[in-house]
Amino acid sequence: MVLWILWRPFGFSGRFLKLESHSITESKSLIPVAWTSLTQMLLEAPGIFLLGQRKRFSTMPETETHERETELFSPPSDVRGMTKLDRTAFKKTVNIPVLKVRKEIVSKLMRSLKRAALQRPGIRRVIEDPEDKESRLIMLDPYKIFTHDSFEKAELSVLEQLNVSPQISKYNLELTYEHFKSEEILRAVLPEGQDVTSGFSRIGHIAHLNLRDHQLPFKHLIGQVMIDKNPGITSAVNKINNIDNMYRNFQMEVLSGEQNMMTKVRENNYTYEFDFSKVYWNPRLSTEHSRITELLKPGDVLFDVFAGVGPFAIPVAKKNCTVFANDLNPESHKWLLYNCKLNKVDQKVKVFNLDGKDFLQGPVKEELMQLLGLSKERKPSVHVVMNLPAKAIEFLSAFKWLLDGQPCSSEFLPIVHCYSFSKDANPAEDVRQRAGAVLGISLEACSSVHLVRNVAPNKEMLCITFQIPASVLYKNQTRNPENHEDPPLKRQRTAEAFSDEKTQIVSNT
């Protein structure tokens, strides 16, 4: 019979222990008096907790692996508060259990010691024995292996077959700055209990961070750590204002590394080049770019009102669609032209450098008059993408009474994909109401809302998709603000469905 206990002596991590009594008769209903007395003594001892009964004698590690790992494999405590990176201050020596084996059997043995071997990125699990060149030392997990009794039966069997002594030795392993992960370094440096930043957006060789106020005193150190710990990153920048100017770019500060903001990125098998300091680019929208691209079929037409450097326009053009792409920012316009040539779609994309409203009321109006006037057999599907979440809904007013003449069939009316931010408790309904208010109609039953991403706590980015009603698009049409004659684009998403999707996406972020 075996008693399992949790032993947590003062000042040490807890460990599970199994204690066996060879003289006890097994019984499902009766525990001998002597064993009962021992149990009571153990329960009264400081730091000991009764867990259950088993049938072997061994020492077991506690289960909170992550917490224990941070205790041993964390930087020295005296780096706390460091604002200028000193890599030499991260040296630390830890005591690691090792198993001495002949070098010719290492490979064969390691396959059987996966559980027991040390699993730590950046640390070699097998090293040369400094006292015997014909032998090797296998690093073992210090939270699983304490003595030879810590090995499992199968592991001991393999050791016996290979004539390896299970005797455990100790090895002083020196940890340096190179051995620690970026999150471990920042957690050790920043004030205790404060959030650390281990994530960033990668734009080619640039790491783009959004630091919080409490992290700013450590900003240069954080930038250098990001460069050190992420191969290929040679510059770290921090956004120092919101995207609130007319060109959608933001001011940034180079925290560490080179000043060069000219970069090249690959997204969905397409290449884009640009000056990141002068244009807008968000790598977190890659999935959204693909989603919209999949909605169009060869021969369709896309009007991209706020095209940036081309993440919507170029993939759509590659599908043999006709694309009209516009951006007010001269730098975006320049790189949009460049990237169209780079991706060999310059013959399929017409590029403009206009204000969004002027683009809609000029080139878009002219093209729509021609497209919607074609015979039914030749009419393509028309899509309008408006990716300017802070203001795009305001530009919907440009569609009001945009066209003259007799309305086309409702099935050929343009489909709008308009992006917006929302901090509302019901963001989908909020976006519907605001977009409908600008158009002067209700979009309640004729639109779908897609949650693009969670931007910040209580701030969502969404895309509302709908067909522009003929009563809005054409002059001299009777309008009913509560409803209109055009069929819904698709079944309306319920608030519950949107809430479920939001919860799922936030949990994956």
UniProtKB/Swiss-Prot annotation:
GO terms for molecular function: tRNA (guanine(37)-N1)-methyltransferase activity; tRNA methyltransferase activity. Pfam families: TRM5-TYW2_MTfase, TYW2_N_2. Gene3D superfamilies: Met-10+ protein-like domains, Vaccinia Virus protein VP39. Its main location: mitochondrion. The keyword S-adenosyl-L-methionine applies. Coiled coil: none annotated. One of its GO terms (cellular component) is mitochondrial matrix. Residues 478-509 are annotated as: Disordered. It catalyses: guanosine(37) in tRNA + S-adenosyl-L-methionine = N(1)-methylguanosine(37) in tRNA + S-adenosyl-L-homocysteine + H(+). Its EC number is 2.1.1.228. It is found in: Mitochondrion matrix; Nucleus; Cytoplasm. Disulfide bonds: none annotated. One of its GO terms (biological process) is tRNA N1-guanine methylation. InterPro entries: MeTrfase_TRM5/TYW2, SAM-dependent_MTases_sf, TRM5-TYW2-like_MTfase, TRM5/TYW2-like_N, tRNA_Gua_MeTrfase_euk. Keywords: Cytoplasm, Disease variant, Methyltransferase, Mitochondrion, Nucleus, Primary mitochondrial disease, S-adenosyl-L-methionine, Transferase, tRNA processing. It is an enzyme of class 2 (transferase). It comes from the Eukaryota. S-adenosyl-L-methionine binds at residues 289, 327-328, 355-356, 387. It is linked to Peripheral neuropathy with variable spasticity, exercise intolerance, and developmental delay: An autosomal recessive mitochondrial disorder with multisystemic and highly variable manifestations. Affected individuals suffer from a peripheral neuropathy, with distal muscle weakness and atrophy, and distal sensory impairment. Additional variable features include early-onset hypotonia and global developmental delay, poor or absent motor skills, exercise intolerance, poor growth, cerebellar signs, spasticity, and seizures. Involved in mitochondrial tRNA methylation. Specifically methylates the N1 position of guanosine-37 in various tRNAs. Methylation is not dependent on the nature of the nucleoside 5' of the target nucleoside. This is the first step in the biosynthesis of wybutosine (yW), a modified base adjacent to the anticodon of tRNAs and required for accurate decoding. Belongs to the class I-like SAM-binding methyltransferase superfamily. TRM5/TYW2 family. Monomer. This is tRNA (guanine(37)-N(1))-methyltransferase. It comes from Homo sapiens (Human). The lineage of its organism: Eukaryota, Metazoa, Chordata, Craniata, Vertebrata. The gene is TRMT5.
